[in-house]
């Protein structure tokens, strides 16, 4: 069998005609320096600020410093395998995280990867972690209440859906407990909660997850964790990942609560990155744009207009102070960004007043308009009662011969402090808060011994569940105070069966 030359040439021609060349062009640079989670690369001339880049071993990085002859990159993962001379290529993408209802009930890292051992998260939706906050015309005034279940907050510093309320205090003053109680209280409220743990011990995060699971709150909660052992870039990105996951629900008309625990550690991580990138340091060695770090995060919390679906994203940022110093750089920055703050004081905490909320310095700038009418009526005099009690308490230590009016104020104040105390993970429905505060402010508790107030309240709530369900239902549905006669009948009815301790 002989093969003719023309057949061979015809076959070659056919192969040439069918040949398609796919040339993949990518911008490639070279690592010239690496260490401490930072790499510098030469040759990435067209890279965007905030663009994802990929190292030759598959680890991703984020382009941050665009300089004349090199690019400063923060490495999002282990950096020990990256060497000088390694290749680094542009991806053309900016940082995105997975979003959607598939994340609910899961524990993820700031890149959206699951860390709870429950398998992969089956979602294809993603959102960029840096996105502009809603504009003025896309927003609406805060008018719906977000019930925390904590009497001292719902009565004195009410929070509305779409508000930013700072929780500030020293370490070990119960900041995380306030957030967990608020999340637990959102059961049956059609609220999605996101808890962002920044720079915490992994054992602490584990305890938080178990607490949420025990109270059935993990069914509507996403936990984003960047623990203390993780590189600084992940601590810096964690809050942005959390708010991005929340925005997906907000723009779909849902209500979201995001807790950032805590932003002091994020600021410290950002300071570390900035100093390693050789950015000029400012006050307390923080970079000049540390205010923008927090403002662009917290401005993404909003109550959207009806045209945008009417969703909301409420932010509860935490700041840890040193020895109660709220005039430091980061605390003053975040106080000026938020719509109010709740101060937790260590001396109150250690004296047994828990939650240790300082009513004098805590304020809510927009939450008052979101408070239900019943609550605003019964809590009107609380702040004054507490303030005059604290003032008179100091004088009462010097003299024993006090007039009747002063003694009455001291007695009312002592009972107010007792009523505002609350057990850990025992959030209270708003209708029960209204009734006990009504009893307090209208003088029904003045003849109950101070030592019995807590027991009186617990037994009263149980009694209401079986004997005054119609009164509870009326407050819950109308959100207004019922007739004084109904309240008096319920409170006096219970006082008849309550046995005071000797």
Swiss-Prot record:
EC number per UniProt: 7.1.2.2
- Offer one Pfam family short name for this entry: ATP-synt_ab_N
Q: Name one GO molecular function term.
A: ADP binding
Q: Which cysteines are joined by disulfide bonds?
A: none
Keyword Cell membrane in record = yes
List, alphabetically, the HAMAP family matched. Answer: ATP_synth_alpha_bact
According to UniProt, the name of this protein is ATP synthase subunit alpha
Source taxonomy lineage? Bacteria, Bacillati, Bacillota, Bacilli, Bacillales
């Amino acid at each position: 069998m002989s093969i003719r030359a023309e057949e061979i040439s015809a076959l070659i021609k056919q192969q040439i005609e069918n040949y398609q060349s796919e040339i993949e062009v990518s911008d490639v640079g070279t690592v010239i320096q690496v260490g401490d989670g930072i790499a510098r690369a030469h040759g990435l001339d067209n890279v965007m600020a905030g663009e994802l880049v990929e190292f030759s071993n598959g680890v991703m990085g984020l382009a941050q410093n665009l300089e004349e002859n090199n690019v400063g990159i923060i490495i999002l993962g282990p950096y020990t395998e990256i060497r000088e001379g390694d290749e680094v290529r542009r991806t053309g993408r900016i940082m995105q995280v997975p979003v959607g209802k598939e994340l609910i009930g899961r524990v993820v890292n700031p890149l959206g990867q699951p860390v709870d051992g429950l398998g992969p998260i089956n979602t294809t939706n993603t959102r960029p972690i840096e996105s502009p906050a809603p504009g003025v015309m896309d927003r609406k005034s805060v008018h719906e209440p977000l019930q925390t279940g904590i009497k001292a907050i719902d009565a004195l510093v009410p929070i509305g859906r779409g508000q930013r309320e700072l929780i500030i205090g020293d370490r070990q003053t119960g900041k995380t407990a306030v957030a967990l109680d608020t999340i637990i209280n959102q059961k049956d409220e059609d609220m999605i909660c996101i808890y962002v743990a920044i720079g915490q011990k992994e054992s602490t995060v584990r305890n938080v997850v178990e607490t949420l699971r025990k109270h059935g709150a993990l069914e509507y909660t996403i936990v984003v964790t960047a623990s203390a052992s993780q590189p600084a870039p992940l601590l810096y990105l964690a809050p942005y990942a959390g708010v991005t996951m929340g925005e997906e629900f907000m723009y779909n008309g849902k209500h979201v609560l995001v807790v950032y625990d805590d932003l002091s550690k994020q600021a410290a991580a950002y300071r570390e990155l900035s100093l390693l990138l050789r950015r000029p340091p400012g006050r307390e060695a923080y970079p000049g744009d540390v205010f923008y770090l927090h403002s662009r995060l917290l401005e993404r919390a909003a109550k959207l207009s009806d045209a945008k679906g009417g969703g909301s994203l409420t932010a509860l940022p935490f700041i840890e102070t040193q020895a109660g110093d709220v005039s430091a750089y980061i605390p003053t920055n975040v106080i000026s960004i938020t719509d109010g703050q709740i101060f937790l004081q260590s001396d109150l905490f250690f004296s047994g007043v828990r939650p240790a909320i300082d009513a004098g310095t805590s304020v809510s700038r927009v939450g008052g308009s979101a408070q239900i009418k019943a609550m605003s009526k019964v809590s009107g005099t609380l702040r004054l009662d507490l303030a005059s009690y604290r003032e008179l308490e100091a004088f009462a230590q010097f003299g024993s011969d006090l007039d009747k009016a002063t003694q009455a104020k001291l007695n009312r104040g002592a009972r107010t402090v007792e009523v505002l105390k609350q057990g850990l993970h025992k959030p209270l429905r708003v209708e029960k808060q209204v009734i006990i505060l009504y009893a307090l402010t209208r003088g029904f508790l003045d003849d109950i011994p101070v030592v019995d107030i807590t027991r009186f309240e617990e037994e009263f709530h149980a009694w209401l569940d079986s004997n005054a369900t119609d009164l509870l239902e009326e407050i819950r549905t109308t959100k207004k105070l019922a007739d004084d006669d109904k309240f008096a009948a319920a409170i006096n009815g219970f006082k008849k069966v309550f046995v005071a301790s000797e």
